[in-house]
Curated annotation (Swiss-Prot):
The active site is at 108. Monomer. It is an enzyme of class 2 (transferase). Keywords: Cytoplasm, DNA damage, DNA repair, DNA replication, DNA-binding, DNA-directed DNA polymerase, Magnesium, Metal-binding, Mutator protein, Nucleotidyltransferase, Transferase. It comes from Vibrio cholerae serotype O1 (strain ATCC 39315 / El Tor Inaba N16961). GO terms for cellular component: cytoplasm. Transmembrane segments: none annotated. It catalyses: DNA(n) + a 2'-deoxyribonucleoside 5'-triphosphate = DNA(n+1) + diphosphate. Pfam families: IMS, IMS_C, IMS_HHH. It comes from the Bacteria. This is DNA polymerase IV. Poorly processive, error-prone DNA polymerase involved in untargeted mutagenesis. Copies undamaged DNA at stalled replication forks, which arise in vivo from mismatched or misaligned primer ends. These misaligned primers can be extended by PolIV. Exhibits no 3'-5' exonuclease (proofreading) activity. May be involved in translesional synthesis, in conjunction with the beta clamp from PolIII. Its EC number is 2.7.7.7. The gene is dinB. GO terms for molecular function: damaged DNA binding; DNA-directed DNA polymerase activity; magnesium ion binding.
């Protein structure tokens, strides 16, 4: 554990896009609802409400598949400008309590309230106040996790969803990590989980007791990362947007995909709108230098392509996708990511858009 005990809050809006639609249209509140593309245009689901999730509908699922699982599903097109506006209102609420805010997307953020004087510095009371403000002012619900380290705050925010709060106090960190199923740790996907299980590793305590060198040999960076997390160590700071050199979004598929068309649907209908929204919200005045695509294959090999391009353009990602898939070699795809490198405010620096520790 770090010497300085931090107070980290992870706030995650509940089914954000769908929740905004239900708020603005009462007729949607009691039905299975999804925001996404039309099945006739080979659309994909961006998000869905909890009624739809009961039928197995999930984000990034083809709309046609979602309708097979839930024939009564009502699919509406996204209103990104509205979601951006609501996200800005949420950010304004965050700023009442701390300036150390790391937005992860329109509906999710880390907050470091270690030095906040609100509510006598109680992170639990601050998290409760944030959730209350969001409900009273925006008529939307948020879930939150509080912990001394980032990854546990994120894990905790999912434990009492929807509209819940979960607090991990410093003295409970190791106990929670020991009992935590590895699939609950951010960055552990389906294929990695199978390999971990084959090695006899199921919960944090299994990793903590494992030999570090063997973990590193078998699992590389993932093994090193899991070993640290299993000891309650996560040294990452809450990084504010003004410190960022790039903006990126990515998605790990619940089932691997293989074709260009499948990749392009997800880029066009999910990843690109999210990247555009995040860029315009966080950095409306800063230009970009490069666009890039990252692909992780089923064998966990990863490749990226980034080219100089001075404006965010969907068509340019089409070109990059064509180029990056020449490296596919028949492999299925488990993750897609898009990124742009921002133009520095003071001087140009030669930095990779996909830093080794930024996309895990």
């Amino acid at each position: 554990m770090q010497d300085r005990i931090r107070k980290i809050i992870h706030v995650d809006m509940d089914c954000f896009f769908a929740a905004v639609e239900m708020r603005d249209n009462p007729a949607y509140r009691e039905i299975a609802l999804a925001v996404g593309g039309h099945e006739k245009q080979r659309g994909v689901i961006s998000t869905c409400n909890y009624q739809a999730r009961k039928f197995g509908v999930r984000s990034a699922m083809p709309t046609a598949q979602a309708l097979k699982l839930c024939p009564q599903l009502h699919v509406v097109p996204g209103r990104m400008s509205v979601y951006k506006s609501v996200s800005q209102q949420i950010q304004t609420i965050f700023q009442r309590y701390t300036s150390l805010i790391e937005p992860l997307s329109l509906d999710e953020a880390y907050l470091d309230v270690s030095e906040s004087t609100a509510y006598q510095g109680s992170a639990t009371l601050i998290a409760q106040a944030i959730r209350r403000d969001i409900w009273q002012e925006l008529n939307l619900t948020a879930s939150a996790g509080v912990a001394p380290i980032k990854f546990l705050a994120k894990v905790a925010s999912d434990l009492n969803k929807p509209d819940g709060l979960y607090v991990v106090t410093p003295d409970k960190v190791q106990e929670m990590v020991d009992s935590l199923p590895l699939e609950k740790i951010p960055g552990v996907g389906k294929v990695a989980l199978e390999k971990l299980h084959q090695a006899g590793l199921y919960v944090g305590a299994d990793v903590r007791r494992a030999d570090y060198r063997k973990l590193l040999h078998q699992f590389g960076r993932l093994g090193a990362s899991l070993w640290k997390k299993s000891h309650g160590i996560d040294e990452r700071e809450v990084v504010t947007e003004r410190e960022r050199k790039s903006v990126g979004v990515e998605y790990t598929f619940s089932q691997n995909i293989s074709t260009f068309q499948e990749c392009w649907q997800v880029i066009e209908q999910k990843l690109y709108p999210e990247l555009d929204a995040r860029l315009s919200r966080a950095h409306p005045q800063r230009g970009i230098i490069k666009q890039g695509i990252k692909v992780k294959f089923a064998d966990f090999q990863q490749t990226t392509i980034e080219h100089v391009h001075p404006a965010l353009e969907l068509d340019y990602f089409h070109e990059l996708l064509e180029q990056v898939l020449t490296r596919q070699q028949g492999r299925e795809i488990r993750l897609l990511g898009l990124s742009v490198m921002l133009k520095p405010e003071l001087q140009m620096k030669q930095l990779s858009m996909f830093p080794s520790d930024g996309w895990q």
